[in-house]
C-alpha cells in the first residue's frame, strides 16, 4: 500500500513507521506545510514493531509509578526523584501535541489510542515499604505529583487493586496511586498520524519498502529503496533523513558512514508477556502496577501488571520477561543482525559489554530458559491467586539498547534513548528504548531544533509551536511560582479534555 506514487526528491525522508517517525513527520509538516516528506516502512503494516501496542508497556511513561526512574537515595537518605519529574514534564509536552492534533483534525477518536488508567506503585517487605514512603514524600513535594496518594492499609489497596492483596501472606505492603495515569497504544497513534501525513500535499508513505543503502550526495542523501512486493529498486534524494527504524537504525547508520556512529553498538533484548483476557479477571484490575526491579534486571524488565486497551478490547499483561536474542527487529529482523553490526570501530565496545555486564547477560539467558511455572511464580508476587490456565505467553518485541563509549570507557549499556545526529545536521537517528515512546515529542523537538534551525527560528513557526505545545521552553521542573503552577494546570487540563481524559 502507498499513500501516493511519491516524489523523486524530497525535503525529508523518514525510515520506519513507529511513533518517532510519525510524530516528527506530523510536527514538521504542521510547522511548514510546504515540506515534501516521504516515509518508508519495511513491513506490510504501519507501526508493527516496537510501537505496536502488544510490544510495549503502553504506560504513558510519566514517571508516576515506574520505580526504576527513582532507584537511588541521596546522602540524606531520601529517594532522589529528579528523573521522574523530568520525564513527567516531557510527557506533558507529548500530550499537548497530541491534543493539538485532535483539535486540528489531524487525528480523530483519541480513545482509540489513549485512555485514563490509574498508575500504581506496589511494594512488599519493610525495606521496600520504607523506600516507597520516602519516594512519595519526594514526589508530592512537586506540583506534578501533588495528587499522589500513599497507603500501607491493605483494605485501601484492596479497593484500588484487589488482585494484589487477595491470597497474600501477612507482610508489610504499601502502594501509591495517581488517578490521572494513562494507557497508550502507540501503534494506533502512529498509524493515525502517518495516514494524516500521507494525505497532505507533497507527502507519501510506502509499505513493504526496505531502505537498503544511504549515500551522500551534493544536496543531502540518496536512498536506495527495495520494493519488496514489486521487486524493483527505487532511488530517492532527500535533504534530511530521519532513521526511526527501531532496531534497524544502527545498521542503516553504519551504512551511511557518519563518523558520529563510531564506537556505538547495539545490545538487543527480547521480551515476553503473560496475557490474561478472561473477562471476570480483567474487570477486577483497572490500573498499571509497577514494582521494583529484581537484581540485574534491565529497566525494560521491571515487573508490572497492566490493564491494557488494545485493538478494541481489554486485557491484562504481566512482565515483561527479558530474553537473550541476536535479532534487532521482532518481525523484520534476522538472527544475523547482531553479528553483522560488529565493526572495527565498535567490536571492543561490544566485547566490554559482555565482560563488564556478566550479571545482565546471565540474567537474560536465565530469563529465556524459564519454564511457564517459573514465570507464574513471578506473577504471583503481584497476583498471589493467579491460575496457570488463565494466562498465555506472547512475544513482547525487541529493544536494541544503545551501547557507547563514555568518559573514555567502552561498554556502557544505556537503558534510555540516544539521538545521534551528523555534524552537518543532514541525518539523525534514534537508538535505544524506554522511555522513548512516551517522551517522543520532546525527542523529535530536539531533532527539529537541531536539524531545522532556520525553520524553528522563524517567527511564524515559533508562534505555531507555542500554540501546539504551550509549555515548550518553560521550566516546569523547578516551578514554584503559584501563577506558573496555575497556568501549567490550565494547559494540562485543556490537553486532557481534548484527549478525552477528563470531563470538559
Predicted stretch roles:
Residues 8-10, 229-240:
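Core beta-strand elements of the Rossmann-like FAD/NAD(P) dinucleotide-binding domain
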Residues 13-15, 40, 211, 236-248, ...:
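Short hydrophobic core segments
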Residues 29-53:
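Glycine-rich FAD pyrophosphate-binding loop
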Residues 58-159, 315, 327, 335-336:
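Dinucleotide-binding Rossmann-like beta1-alpha1 core, especially the glycine-rich loop
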Residues 108-117, 122-200, 204-206, 214-219, ...:
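Flavin (FAD/FMN) cofactor-binding and adjacent substrate-gating region
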Residues 171-180, 188, 328-457:
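C-terminal catalytic lobe of FAD-dependent flavoproteins
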Residues 243-259:
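Flavin (primarily FAD) binding-site architecture
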Amino acid at each position: 500500500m502507498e499513500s501516493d506514487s511519491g516524489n523523486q526528491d524530497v525535503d525529508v525522508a523518514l525510515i520506519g513507521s513507529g511513533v518517532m517517525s510519525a510524530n516528527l513527520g506530523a510536527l514538521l509538516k504542521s510547522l511548514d506545510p510546504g515540506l515534501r516528506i516521504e516515509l518508508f516502512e519495511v513491513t506490510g503494516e504501519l507501526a508493527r514493531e516496537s510501537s505496536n501496542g502488544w510490544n510495549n508497556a503502553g504506560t504513558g511513561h510519566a514517571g508516576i509509578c515506574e520505580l526504576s526512574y527513582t532507584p537511588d537515595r541521596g546522602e540524606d537518605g531520601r529517594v532522589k526523584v529528579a528523573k521522574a519529574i523530568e520525564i513527567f514534564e516531557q510527557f506533558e509536552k507529548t500530550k499537548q501535541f497530541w491534543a493539538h492534533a485532535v483539535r486540528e483534525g489531524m487525528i480523530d477518536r483519541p480513545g482509540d489510542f489513549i485512555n485514563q488508567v490509574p498508575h500504581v506503585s506496589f511494594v512488599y517487605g519493610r525495606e521496600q515499604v520504607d523506600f516507597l514512603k520516602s519516594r512519595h514524600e519526594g514526589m508530592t513535594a512537586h506540583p506534578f505529583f501533588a495528587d499522589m496518594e500513599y497507603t500501607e492499609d491493605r483494605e485501601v489497596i484492596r479497593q484500588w487493586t484487589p488482585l494484589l492483596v487477595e491470597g497474600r501472606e501477612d507482610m508489610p505492603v504499601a502502594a501509591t496511586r495517581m488517578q490521572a495515569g494513562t494507557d497508550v497504544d502507540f501503534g494506533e497513534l502512529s498509524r493515525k498520524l502517518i495516514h494524516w501525513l500521507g494525505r497532505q500535499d507533497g507527502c507519501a508513505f510506502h509499505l513493504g519498502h526496505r531502505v537498503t543503502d544511504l549515500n551522500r550526495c551534493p544536496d543531502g542523501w540518496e536512498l536506495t529503496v527495495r520494493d519488496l512486493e514489486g521487486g524493483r529498486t527505487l532511488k530517492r534524494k532527500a535533504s534530511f533523513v530521519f532513521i526511526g527504524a527501531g532496531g534497524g537504525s544502527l545498521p542503516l547508520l553504519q551504512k551511511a558512514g557518519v563518523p558520529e556512529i563510531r564506537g556505538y553498538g547495539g545490545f538487543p533484548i527480547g521480551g515476553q508477556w503473560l496475557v490474561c483476557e478472561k473477562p471476570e479477571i480483567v474487570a477486577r484490575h483497572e490500573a498499571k502496577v509497577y514494582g521494583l526491579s529484581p537484581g540485574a534486571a534491565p529497566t525494560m524488565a521491571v515487573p508490572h501488571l497492566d490493564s491494557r486497551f488494545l485493538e478494541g478490547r481489554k486485557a491484562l499483561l504481566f512482565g515483561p520477561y527479558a530474553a537473550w536474542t541476536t535479532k534487532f527487529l521482532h518481525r523484520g529482523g534476522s538472527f544475523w543482525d547482531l553479528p553483522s553490526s560488529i565493526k572495527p570501530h565498535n567490536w571492543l565496545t561490544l566485547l566490554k559489554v559482555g565482560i563488564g555486564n556478566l550479571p545482565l547477560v546471565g540474567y537474560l539467558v536465565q530469563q529465556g530458559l524459564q519454564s511457564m511455572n517459573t514465570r507464574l511464580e513471578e506473577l504471583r508476587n503481584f497476583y498471589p491467586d493467579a491460575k496457570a490456565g488463565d494466562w498465555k505467553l506472547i512475544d513482547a518485541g525487541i529493544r536494541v539498547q544503545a551501547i557507547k563509549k563514555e568518559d573514555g570507557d567502552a561498554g556502557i549499556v544505556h537503558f534510555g534513548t540516544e539521538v545521534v545526529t551528523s555534524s552537518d545536521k543532514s541525518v539523525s537517528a534514534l537508538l535505544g528504548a524506554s522511555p522513548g515512546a512516551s517522551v517522543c515529542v520532546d525527542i523529535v523537538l530536539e531533532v527539529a531544533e537541531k536539524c531545522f534551525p532556520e525553520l524553528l527560528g522563524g517567527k511564524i513557526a515559533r508562534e505555531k509551536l507555542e500554540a501546539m505545545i504551550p509549555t515548550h521552553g518553560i521550566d516546569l521542573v523547578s516551578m514554584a511560582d503559584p501563577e506558573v503552577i496555575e497556568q501549567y494546570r490550565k494547559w494540562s487540563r485543556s490537553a486532557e479534555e481534548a484527549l478525552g481524559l477528563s470531563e470538559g
